[in-house]
């Protein structure tokens, strides 16, 4: 991972950053309204930034524009980014951090178009709030970049109209606009579930079209880019009421093979749209709808971890346009898609190819033919598959769905060939000359 977003999420609309700084013994425990739990504030800004530095992540902070104010957001920028000599920077120094945290990415609230959100307001009201916050925050530190709240789901009646109004009002103060999507198979329709990639592609392209429209309408040299700062599979684990407990177990989804293939589809879509999708954050990372589950001191690697890991270690390079020529099918709600989903990254002397076979029954013969290069050999290849679409890992059986070395790739006459098993995902690194 390269960036980490904190503190969320619906949590952000009730979080006041000053509660989470200073000596831990002096920090207040507060009732957290989004998830109906108790927040002890023992982990706050300084702990988060320290964790990011330790892990090599870029910190990304979400200001409270639900129950908070633009001034509170500005003060948080001062606390994090300004040299000592003023009130909030001196507060940071008094808390043991004399050097600025230099946080570059700032989200202007979370899902403010959602009626469930604390402080939800219509688009025109949020746009004023966001514009005020962005101006004050950038006046405090002109190097930061801001993410305005876009439509968090295509199902709300304000879809696209919210984005237009916000972008038109906030203008060039918005560096990015956010998108969210959680995919699910509530109808137990595996082919349609796996075709959700088509809907992800459409969502990205429609929001980008709104950004281009506003850029043209405003006659601006700048255009907001896309920040897909919440995405995942989520539909089996329900209920978000913590019943007033501290650190309750909430929405701990168990993921299976088809979920992992959908996660691969999300990532393929992001790579294909890398010219406009510049930031993407899976939600979450541990326990709550997460690739990793814990039990006591035990750790379970869930199925969705594997495509993320297989692709992350091959992420460096330039996204290439990919054309898939082969059979297709029509999902019940998501539309027509090829059986093979693909994305490609060109690194230094290496071509990284990511392939998913959506078919439940048929293996897919694949020939990889670069337009302006020749494949010289296979550097590495992995495949992810399992005994069936509902196969899942457990603490008792942790490797039911797991990645393994893939030897069935041949290179001949500048092309690579393989046969992709049903319901599988492959990641290849091919030397090119």
Predicted regions and their residues:
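Glycan-recognition and catalytic regions of carbohydrate-active enzymes
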Residues: 278-350
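Short, well-ordered beta-strand segments enriched in hydrophobic/aromatic residues
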Residues: 350-358
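C-terminal beta-sandwich/jelly-roll accessory domains of carbohydrate-active enzymes
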Residues: 323-338, 358-433
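Noncatalytic carbohydrate-binding groove/subsite architecture in carbohydrate-active enzymes
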Residues: 123-266, 273, 324-335
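Substrate-binding cleft of secreted/luminal carbohydrate-active enzymes
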Residues: 259-289
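Conserved, mostly hydrophobic/aromatic
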Residues: 52, 76, 106, 177, ...
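Short, solvent-exposed beta-strand-terminating loops
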Residues: 2-22, 224, 232-238, 384-392
């Amino acid at each position: 991972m390269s960036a980490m977003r904190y503190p969320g999420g619906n949590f952000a609309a009730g979080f006041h950053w000053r509660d989470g700084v200073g000596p831990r013994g002096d920090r207040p425990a507060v009732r957290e309204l989004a998830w109906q739990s108790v927040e002890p504030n023992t982990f706050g800004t300084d702990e988060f930034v320290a964790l990011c530095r330790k892990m090599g992540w870029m910190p990304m902070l979400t200001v409270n524009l639900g129950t908070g104010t633009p001034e509170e957001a500005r003060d948080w920028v001062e606390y994090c980014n300004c040299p000592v000599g003023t009130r909030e920077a001196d507060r940071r120094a008094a808390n043991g951090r004399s050097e600025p945290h230099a946080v570059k990415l700032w989200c202007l609230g979370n899902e403010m178009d959602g009626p469930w959100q604390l402080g939800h307001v219509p688009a025109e009201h949020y746009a004023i709030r966001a514009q005020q916050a962005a101006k004050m925050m950038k006046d405090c530190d002109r190097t930061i970049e801001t993410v305005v709240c876009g439509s968090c789901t295509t199902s709300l009646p304000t879809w696209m109209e919210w984005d237009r109004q916000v972008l038109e009002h906030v203008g060039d103060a918005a560096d990015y606009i956010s998108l969210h999507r959680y995919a699910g198979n509530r109808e137990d329709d595996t082919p349609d579930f796996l075709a959700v990639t088509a809907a992800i592609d459409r969502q990205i392209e429609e929001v980008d079209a709104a950004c281009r429209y506003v850029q043209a309408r405003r006659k601006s040299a700048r255009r907001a880019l896309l920040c897909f700062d919440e995405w995942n599979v989520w539909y089996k684990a329900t209920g978000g009421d913590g019943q007033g407990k501290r650190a309750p177990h909430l929405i701990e989804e168990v993921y299976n093979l088809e979920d992992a293939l959908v996660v691969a589809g999300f990532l393929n879509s992001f790579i294909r749209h890398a010219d406009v999708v510049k930031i993407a954050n899976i939600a979450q990372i541990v326990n709550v709808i997460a690739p990793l589950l814990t039990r006591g001191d035990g750790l379970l690697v869930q199925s969705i971890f594997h495509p993320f890991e297989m692709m992350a270690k091959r992420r460096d390079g330039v996204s290439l346009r990919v054309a898939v020529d082969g059979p297709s099918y029509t999902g019940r709600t998501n539309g027509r898609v090829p059986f093979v989903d693909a994305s490609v990254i060109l690194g230094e002397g290496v071509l990284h190819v990511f392939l998913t076979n959506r078919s439940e029954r048929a293996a897919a013969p694949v020939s990889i033919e670069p337009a302006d290069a020749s494949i010289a050999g296979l550097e590495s290849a992995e495949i992810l598959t399992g005994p069936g679409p509902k196969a899942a890992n457990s603490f008792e059986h942790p490797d039911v769905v797991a990645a393994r070395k893939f030897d069935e790739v041949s290179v001949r006459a500048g092309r690579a060939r393989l046969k992709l098993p049903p319901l599988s995902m492959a990641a290849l690194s091919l030397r090119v000359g």
